[in-house]
Each structure stands twice: as structure tokens, then as C-alpha cells.
């Protein structure tokens, strides 16, 4: 990419040099007598060609350091010319800078007092030589490859502005996430330290130990560790995103020199180093907590060993029991064991004093190893930080060197281009004309193609917009219909509730009858254009619409009275009877006990062999089960005086059932309308 950018800058510098040479040309001199024909013209042409070739070699050697290295290795005297014109080679400068940075890194690392073995340095991969690039001679007769135009300052400014906005947002987000991760890490460290402190207090004070606090502290520490792990992952992801934006900006030639890139990279390095340092602190806290865990394990082991010894001496005594007295033998055995234990502990103490120095040296060795691990981690973190900082300094130095190189190259190309500016002007003018012709033709074709594509897209967008408008219109209609269906469904349920309960404020049967005119008119207002609804509303009985129907419970209560009176007059025919006949029927009803029976839905009724008692019993069962429809069918089979008494009840019950059936049809119609209008 740098080579392509350098070639572009070379071509643009040549153009500017020719323009300046044309503007600053001397005034026309008086005509000179044409020289005589001689061999001087050929010599001048040869000298001009030599100068042009030498200038091309010098320019390409500046652009491609590998080509310069090959030329210097092939022709050693050329090295002095290149050093005088172009300065010292960039490869040598880079090697020298790498050596200086290596010395700086080595000096920056703090040296320990102990003499450590030297680190083995991995050998650098050998630099593979590139294949020599073939330079084709310029031929005016051939088509010149169109040059990629340099982006305008507005485009460069817009891209840099966009990059800066992205970098600011990414830096702010990364800093926020790293701040959250740091706070979570600090909470984890506090939780680990708290767990270690509670564990030490619990182990030291075994009598009043509360291990639930230790468990809860450990759970808090683990929970905080999970939280800070997630926060750390988020923070590093945001840092990687910031570095990705920086790398993308460096790859783009228009934004590669933006000074904010280096600052953003430095910020990313600092944030990453901050996470590494806080991780080192967390590891240190966990290591200190591990020492307390080992101490707790040793205490538990000694207590278990003592419990086993006590159990072997006093197998029948629960040493963990409270408020239990020991007998004399158990106390003697316990005292003897205590004396033996004291003697044993004295011997162990003397041995322990001998081994104490070994244990201390071992503990010091373990602590030294732990300190070395921590120091190694800190050293690796610091080395990575120093390495990233040095890389950043190298990039900053490269940016500064690149700007100085570009200035030197521009001055050298101006001096080199002054000798053959006229010839190159003619060539470039011709190539530019050809390029403009081709470019204008391509632009016209692209504009025409884009215009056709735009027309197609506009047509498709208009068609899509019309479809969306139609869909929205139909959806509005469906919404209105669905809303009306829901209102109709609610009104239908209110109608059923009115049929079932009537006027709840009524004190007697007649006052609880509520006319249905108001509810039916409300249904007509909700669906004024529905013929099915109007037909069902017109089918309601007039008595139900004007006076109202009895409620279901009132009809059941009336049937209870009808059942009692019907059994008393079951033996009376339609023409009535004497007082003795009524008395006999009453006495007969007293001696005939209605045994509860279960009648099935498929049981047939023999009309000729069924009396009024069985009919009333069947009707009572159906009424109690809430099946008024079958109750009416059975009650219609009554004969004599009970049939006359049941006539009004049958009419009122039939009116109630008809109204309820019509209301249920309206509810079903409302449910279907609601489902149909749901999209």
C-alpha cells in the first residue's frame, strides 16, 4: 500500500513540478540562428536520455528499498550516489532503530540482584529477497493506464471526521467497560479477602464457629468472580474493537496519518495493561486465601484425629454430646489418655523444634516460588506494556519520518523533473486527453445505467408503497371489525348474564324478571348491518323482550313447588275430583316415598305404563342436573291435574330456553366474527 501511495505521490509531484516550471519560465529570447547540421544534436539526445534514465532509477530506488538494495549490491559505487541524493537507506535506519529499541527495552527492565541465566533469543527469520521488478519503457503510441485520482480534501476531511467520531465512541465505550471490569475485580478482591478473614476467625474460634458465614462468603466471592469474568470479557472485546478501528484507519491511505490513531492505540494499550494489573492483584488475593484454606485443612485434620483417638478410648461415649456426665472409669481413661497425649506432645514439640528450621526454610522456599511467579507475571505484563509502547513509538517515528521523506522526495523530484519537463508534459497531456475521453464516456455510461436502475427502483418502491397502503387500509378495516366483534361478544355475554340472573336487586320472582329490549337494542347498535343478528333478535319471544324471563334458579324453585303440589294431586284427572278424591291423593302421596334413582339419558319412557309419580321424579332429576330441556319434555307427559298445574311452568321455561339458545347463537356468531377479523 505504501508503494502504491508513493507512486501516486511521485506522479502528482511530477505534474506540480511541470506546472511550476511552465509558470516560472523565462521570457522568450530573441530568435537564434539555426545551428549548422552536425553531430551535436545526437549527443544532446543521448545525454537527455541518460538523465531521464538516471532520474527514473533514482526515483524508483526511493520508492522501493529492495530495488535500491539490489542496485547497491550489484553496483557498489552507486551506494554513494544514492546516499548523497536520497539519504541513508530506510532498511539500515530500521535496523538501527530496532537495535536502539532493543537496548531501551533491556535497560527498562529492572535487573535483579541474583544472576539469572541469559535468555535465549529466537533468531529472526531471514529477509527473503524479492524478485526484480521489470520497468516497461514509456511508449506514447500505447494507451496510458488511467491513474487513480487523489481523493478530494472534502472526502479526506469527511473520512477523517468519521474515523475520529468512531474512535471517540470506541474509546469512551472501552473506558466505561474497563472501568466496570476494574470495579468488579476490586469487588472480587474484597470478597476474597472477606472470605479469608471470616475463615480465619471461624477456624481460630472453633467454639463459636459459624460455617454458614464462611459458605456465604465463599458464594459471594465466586459470584463476584463470575461477574468480573464477564465484565473483563466485555472490556477486552471493546478494546479489540478499538484496535480493529485503529487498524482499519491505518489501512486506509486517506486516514493513515490521522494523529488520533496513535492516541487511540496508546489508550487501548493502557486499558489492556490496566486489566492485566488488576488480574495480577486478584491472583495474589487468591494465593493468600489458598494459604488460609491449607491452614483450615490442617486444623480440621487434627480435630478429626483427636476425635478418632477419643472414640478408640471411649467407644460408648459421644464426645459431641452436651450436658452429659462421665463415670469414674471414663474419667480415669480420659485423664490417662490426656497424660499420654501431653507426653506425646512434649516429644513432638522437641522434634518439632528440630524440624522447625526445615519447615521455615520450606515455607520460605514456597513463598519465594510464589513471589517469583507473581514477579514473573508482573514482568510479563510490564514487558508486554513496554513492547506495545515501543511499537507505538516506532509507528510515531515512522509517521514523522514518512512526512520528512515525502518532503525530501518532493524537492528531489522537482530538481530531477526540470530537465525533461517538456517531453513529459506532452506525453502526459496526450494521455490525459485520452483518459478524459474514456473517463467521460464511462461516466456517461455509468450515469445512464444508474439512471435506469434508479427508475426501476423508484417504480418498485412506488409499487411496494401502494401495496403497503392497501394492506394498511385492509388492516384498519379488520381492526374496526375485530373491535366491533369484541364489543358484540361482550354485549352477548351481558345478555346471557341477564337471562341467567335477571334483576339481581329484585326481592321476588316477578321483580327479578328483566326485559331484554335494552340489551337487544345495544346488540343492534353494535352490528346494525348484520342480517343474521337482526334475524336472531327478531326471533326472541315477545314476552322475553317486553316483560322478561324468569331466571334459571327461579324456574328451579317453581318446579320444587310444582313437584310438591303435583305429587299431592297426582291421582286427580283433568276434570277434577271430589274432596275425598283430593284427600285420598294427598294421603297416597304421603305413603309413596320417592326413592332417589338415576335415570340415564338413553333410558326409554313407556308412556302407557308411566304414572305421574315417575314422571315427576324424572323431571326432578333433570332439573337438579340443570337440564331444563329434558325436564320440559318429561313434564309434558303429565296427565290430569298435575299437567294443568305445570302448564305455566312449561311456557315460562320454554321462553327461557328459547331466549338462552338465541343468546348462545349470538355468542357463537360473535366468536366467529372475532376469529375471522383477527390477522
Swiss-Prot record:
Residues spanning the membrane: 43-63
Mitochondrial matrix-side positions: 18-42
Keywords: Cytoplasm, Membrane, Mitochondrion, Mitochondrion inner membrane, Transit peptide, Transmembrane, Transmembrane helix
Matching InterPro entries: MIC60 (IPR019133)
Interval spanned by the transit peptide: 1-17
Bilayer disposition of the protein: Single-pass membrane protein
Mitochondrial intermembrane domain ranges by topology: 64-679
Region (Disordered), start-end ranges: 1-42
Tissue localization of expression: Expressed in the gonads and muscle cells.
Phenotypic effect of disruption: Egg-laying defects, defective oogenesis in 30% of mutants, reduced brood size and increased resistance to oxidative stress inducer paraquat. Abnormal mitochondrial morphology with mitochondria appearing larger and as localized swellings and tubular extensions. Mitochondria also have elongated and curved cristae that are stacked with a reduced number of junctions.
Subcellular localization, as worded in the UniProt entry: Mitochondrion inner membrane; Cytoplasm
One BP term from GO: mitochondrion organization
GO CC aspect terms: MICOS complex; mitochondrial inner membrane; proton-transporting ATP synthase complex
Compositionally biased intervals (Polar residues): 8-23
Family: Belongs to the MICOS complex subunit Mic60 family.
PANTHER family: MICOS COMPLEX SUBUNIT MIC60, MITOFILIN
Function: Sustains mitochondrial morphology probably through maintaining cristae morphology. May act as a component of the MICOS complex, a large protein complex of the mitochondria.
Quaternary state and interactors: Component of the mitochondrial contact site and cristae organizing system (MICOS) complex.
Name the record gives this protein: MICOS complex subunit MIC60-1
Organism: Caenorhabditis elegans
Amino acid at each position: 500500500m505504501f508503494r502504491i501511495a508513493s507512486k501516486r505521490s511521485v506522479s502528482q509531484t511530477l505534474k506540480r513540478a511541470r506546472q511550476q516550471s511552465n509558470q516560472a519560465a523565462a521570457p522568450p529570447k530573441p530568435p537564434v540562428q539555426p545551428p549548422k547540421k552536425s553531430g551535436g544534436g545526437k549527443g544532446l539526445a543521448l545525454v537527455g536520455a541518460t538523465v531521464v534514465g538516471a532520474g527514473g532509477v533514482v526515483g524508483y530506488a526511493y520508492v522501493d528499498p529492495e530495488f535500491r538494495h539490489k542496485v547497491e549490491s550489484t553496483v557498489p559505487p552507486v551506494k554513494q550516489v544514492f546516499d548523497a541524493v536520497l539519504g541513508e537507506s530506510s532498511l539500515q535506519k530500521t535496523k538501527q532503530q530496532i537495535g536502539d529499541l532493543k537496548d531501551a527495552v533491556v535497560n527498562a527492565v529492572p535487573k535483579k540482584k541474583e544472576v539469572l541465566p541469559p535468555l535465549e533469543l529466537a533468531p529472526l527469520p531471514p529477509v527473503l529477497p524479492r524478485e526484480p521488478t521489470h520497468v516497461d519503457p514509456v511508449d506514447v503510441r500505447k494507451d496510458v493506464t488511467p491513474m487513480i485520482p487523489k481523493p478530494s480534501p472534502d472526502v479526506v476531511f469527511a473520512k477523517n471526521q468519521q474515523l475520529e467520531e468512531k474512535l471517540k465512541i470506541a474509546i469512551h465505550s472501552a473506558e466505561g467497560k474497563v472501568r466496570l471490569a476494574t470495579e468488579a475485580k476490586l469487588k472480587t478482591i474484597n470478597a476474597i479477602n472477606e472470605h479469608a478473614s471470616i475463615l480465619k476467625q471461624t477456624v481460630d474460634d472453633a467454639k463459636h464457629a459459624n460455617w454458614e458465614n464462611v459458605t456465604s462468603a465463599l458464594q459471594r466471592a465466586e459470584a463476584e468472580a463470575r461477574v468480573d469474568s464477564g465484565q473483563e470479557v466485555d472490556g477486552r472485546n471493546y478494546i479489540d474493537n478499538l484496535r480493529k478501528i485503529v487498524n482499519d484507519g491505518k489501512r486506509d491511505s486517506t486516514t493513515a496519518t490521522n494523529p488520533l490513531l496513535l492516541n487511540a492505540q496508546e489508550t487501548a494499550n493502557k486499558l489492556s495493561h490496566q486489566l492485566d494489573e488488576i488480574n495480577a492483584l486478584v491472583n495474589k488475593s487468591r494465593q493468600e486465601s489458598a494459604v488460609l484454606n491449607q491452614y483450615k485443612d490442617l486444623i480440621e485434620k487434627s480435630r478429626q484425629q483427636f476425635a478418632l483417638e477419643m472414640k478408640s478410648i471411649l467407644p460408648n461415649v459421644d464426645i459431641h454430646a452436651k450436658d452429659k456426665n462421665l463415670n469414674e472409669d471414663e474419667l480415669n481413661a480420659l485423664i490417662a489418655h490426656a497424660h499420654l497425649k501431653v507426653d506425646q506432645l512434649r516429644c513432638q514439640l522437641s522434634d518439632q523444634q528440630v524440624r522447625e528450621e526445615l519447615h521455615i526454610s520450606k515455607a520460605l522456599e514456597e513463598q519465594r516460588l510464589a513471589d517469583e511467579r507473581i514477579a514473573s507475571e508482573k514482568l510479563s505484563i510490564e514487558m508486554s506494556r513496554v513492547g506495545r509502547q515501543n511499537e507505538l513509538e516506532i509507528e510515531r517515528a515512522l509517521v514523522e519520518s514518512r512526512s520528512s521523506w515525502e518532503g525530501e522526495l518532493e524537492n528531489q523530484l522537482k530538481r530531477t523533473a526540470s530537465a525533461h519537463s517538456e517531453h513529459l508534459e506532452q506525453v502526459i497531456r496526450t494521455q490525459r486527453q485520452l483518459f478524459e475521453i474514456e473517463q467521460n464516456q464511462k461516466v456517461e455510461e455509468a450515469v445512464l445505467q444508474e439512471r435506469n436502475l434508479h427508475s426501476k427502483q423508484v417504480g418498485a418502491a412506488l409499487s411496494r408503497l401502494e401495496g403497503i397502503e392497501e394492506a394498511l387500509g385492509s388492516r384498519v378495516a379488520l381492526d374496526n371489525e375485530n373491535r366491533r366483534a369484541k364489543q358484540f361478544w361482550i354485549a352477548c355475554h351481558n345478555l346471557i348474564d341477564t337471562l341467567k340472573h335477571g334483576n339481581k336487586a329484585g326481592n321476588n320472582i316477578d321483580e327479578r324478571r328483566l326485559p331484554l329490549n335494552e340489551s337487544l337494542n345495544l346488540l343492534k347498535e353494535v352490528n346494525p348491518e348484520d342480517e343474521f343478528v337482526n334475524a336472531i333478535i327478531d326471533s326472541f319471544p315477545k314476552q322475553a323482550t317486553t316483560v322478561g324471563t324468569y331466571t334459571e334458579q327461579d324456574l328451579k324453585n317453581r318446579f320444587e313447588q310444582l313437584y310438591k303440589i303435583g305429587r299431592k294431586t297426582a291421582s286427580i284427572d283433568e276434570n277434577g275430583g271430589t274432596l275425598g278424591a283430593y284427600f285420598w291423593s294427598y294421603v297416597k302421596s304421603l305413603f309413596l316415598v320417592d326413592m332417589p334413582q338415576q335415570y340415564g339419558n338413553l333410558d326409554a319412557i313407556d308412556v302407557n305404563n308411566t304414572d305421574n309419580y315417575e314422571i315427576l321424579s324424572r323431571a326432578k332429576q333433570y332439573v337438579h342436573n340443570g337440564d331444563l330441556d329434558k325436564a320440559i319434555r318429561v313434564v309434558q307427559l303429565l296427565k290430569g291435574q298435575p299437567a294443568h298445574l305445570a302448564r305455566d311452568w312449561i311456557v315460562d321455561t320454554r321462553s327461557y330456553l328459547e331466549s338462552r339458545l338465541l343468546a348462545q347463537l349470538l355468542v357463537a356468531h360473535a366468536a366467529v366474527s372475532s376469529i375471522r377479523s383477527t390477522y
